[in-house]
Design a protein with these regions (language model features):
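Flexible, polar/acidic helix-loop-strand segments at domain edges
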Residues: 93-99, 327-407
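Conserved, well-structured interaction surfaces
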Residues: 43, 47-51, 55-60, 85-162, ...
Length: 542
């Protein structure tokens, strides 16, 4: 049974505070109401107030067509090809794979709308506090700072995905208010300023009360991520790699976090006690009841795998890993077998599962590292996602918490920043530290050198489907570092960001994808938003 914390129990407090009828739904439908003047909440009510801002992170990241898809389905790691049972869906996944999305597509739209929902929730509670409607006494400074850091985390997403977006910091805006658009550089500087001014006021506690919330160390980890991406996020006006190292050192020096000896423990169902997780999105199949709350098992595994795990719902069988990506792994790397499901599939009682569709009906369901093309595939093609534990008997929703920031990320952010500032050997020691647990049977393979990190990638870029084969042997600066990130962080909703930072997102081909245009490093502002706000100017290339 998962430990219930602030974000599992938040709705009871929110419902009591705001007078809503529901105490189980996590849909943000009634926060436009302001609490009564002079209401003084208890400690539990304060947690509930904060949770209204945190709930949007779950929706933003992992609900259907959320940010996780925006960060993964367009990359060199993952693909949803057409399957015998569908997955064409109007061509949306093909457009994502080939970087041909438009301002009308739902994935950019949901990424924008849900992120601003989170910002609005933060602004609403800040308004209630700062206007005196909610009196917090000595707690006010810390709570206001936490809300501002949380709000900044949403702007981090917007800076990454869209770049040039409105910065809205008020809830009490006049009727008909339309915010001005800010440059990507201004958004970057706003986020950094909000974080640096407010992190010192955050709690240093690492316990159940602060799980799934921004404490000081989660704040510094987010700040490090901003600094690591500074050159991209600021349109080249900042190169804050030394500041990234400083922020990482504050997290490392706290002594609050550590690598799990067994990496898989970060991703098990009951992972809330992991010392590696710095900031997580809590999920529970009972308390988080959005239909697509966290459904990696549903849209990766084939329907037949219901019998493997005794799922309460039948999987749909869509997304898989790209063969070129799988081919980059050392066969002795535990992450290859821990993160992906391959080979012949069996039921929970040991019976061999058989294919039920396409050209393979009646044959054993045997996941193979081959996919025909984006336009057509057999149901056994492509290794399936398996990084997060799929517990026996679960519903269509996983109960694993989703780690957005973890200690391995801090170590590798520092390593990359060291590499980019000419300290490759120091970087190599950190990378080796992260690799070591993944090569326990072959410890000699864990070590990596500075010169290796400075070298190119082992990814065999080039078009590689049944219709066409091309080869791209061009060098990738620090490509081995990009490989290390790819091996460590698959299925964690971040590959696009890493590829953009290393300059390969729009310049390389893979599977059924040809090199695209640099304008695809940003998503388009959804057309619906431009029609609503005439002050918004579309990103170049759309």
């Amino acid at each position: 049974m998962k430990t219930r914390n602030l974000l599992y129990t938040c709705l009871v407090g929110v419902a009591a505070l705001l007078g809503t009828a529901s105490c189980t739904r996590l849909e943000d439908t009634s926060y436009n109401r302001i609490v009564a003047d002079g209401f003084e909440p208890t400690d539990e009510d304060v947690a509930s107030l904060l949770s209204s801002g945190y709930v949007s992170w779950r929706k933003t990241m992992l609900l259907w067509n959320g940010v996780a898809r925006a960060e993964m389905l367009c990359t060199d790691q993952d693909v949803i090809p057409a399957r015998p049972n569908g997955w064409v869906d109007g061509g949306v996944y093909k457009r994502m794979h080939q970087h041909k999305w438009t301002s009308e597509d739902d994935i950019p739209l949901q990424s924008w709308v849900r992120t601003y929902d989170g910002i609005n929730a933060c602004n609403r509670v800040l308004y209630q506090i700062e206007s005196g409607q909610i009196k917090l006494g000595d707690r006010q400074t810390a709570i206001v700072s936490e809300l501002k850091v949380l709000r900044a985390s949403y702007y981090y997403l917007l800076d990454d995905l869209f770049g040039n977006v409105p910065i809205v910091t008020r809830f009490d805006v006049p009727e008909g208010f339309l915010p001005d658009q800010s440059s990507r550089k201004d958004v970057y500087e706003f986020v950094v300023k909000e974080l640096t001014e407010n992190i010192p006021n955050l709690s240093e506690r690492v316990d159940n009360a602060y799980y799934g919330r921004f404490n000081k160390w989660a704040g510094y980890a987010l700040l490090a991520k901003m600094y690591l991406n500074s050159e991209v996020f600021s349109d080249g006006t900042h190169k804050d790699y030394d500041k990234c190292i400083e922020a990482c050192d504050l997290v490392i020096g706290s002594g609050k976090y550590a690598l799990e000896a067994t990496r898989k423990n970060v991703f098990v169902t009951n992972n809330e006690k992991s010392r590696e997780i710095i900031f997580a999105l809590p999920f529970d199949e009972t308390y988080v009841d959005d239909w697509n709350a966290f459904d990696f098992h549903m849209y990766s595994l084939q329907p037949e795998n219901q019998a493997t795990y005794n799922f309460q719902a039948t999987p749909w069988g869509g997304v898989c890993a790209l063969p070129q990506y799988i081919d980059t792994f050392d066969p002795d790397d535990r992450r290859l077998r821990d993160d992906f499901i391959a080979g012949v599939q069996f039921s929970a009682t040991g019976d061999t599962l058989k294919c039920t569709m396409g050209n393979l009906v009646g044959r054993p369901l045997d996941y193979v590292n081959h996919v025909n093309s984006i336009d057509g595939s057999e149901e056994n093609q492509g290794l399936r996602w398996g990084k997060f534990e799929y517990a026996q008997g679960i519903t269509n929703r996983l109960s694993n918490d989703f780690p957005l920031l973890r200690y391995a990320d801090v170590l590798l952010m520092k390593a990359e920043a060291l590499l980019r500032t000419g300290r490759a050997d120091e970087a190599a020691r950190l990378v080796t530290e992260v690799r070591r647990r993944n090569f326990t049977d072959h410890p000699e393979k864990a070590a990596v050198s500075g010169s290796q990190l400075e070298g190119t990638t082992c990814y065999d870029y080039g078009r590689r489907d049944d219709s066409r084969t091309t080869h791209d042997g061009a060098q990738v600066k620090y490509g081995r570092m990009l490989d290390e990130l790819g091996w460590e962080f698959s299925q964690e909703g971040r590959r696009r960001q890493d590829m953009v930072r290393f300059g390969v997102f729009t310049t390389r081909a893979w599977f059924s994808h040809d090199a695209s245009d640099a304008t695809r490093n940003l998503y388009p502002i959804p057309n619906r938003q431009i029609l609503t706000n005439g002050k918004l100017k579309q990103n170049p290339g759309y």
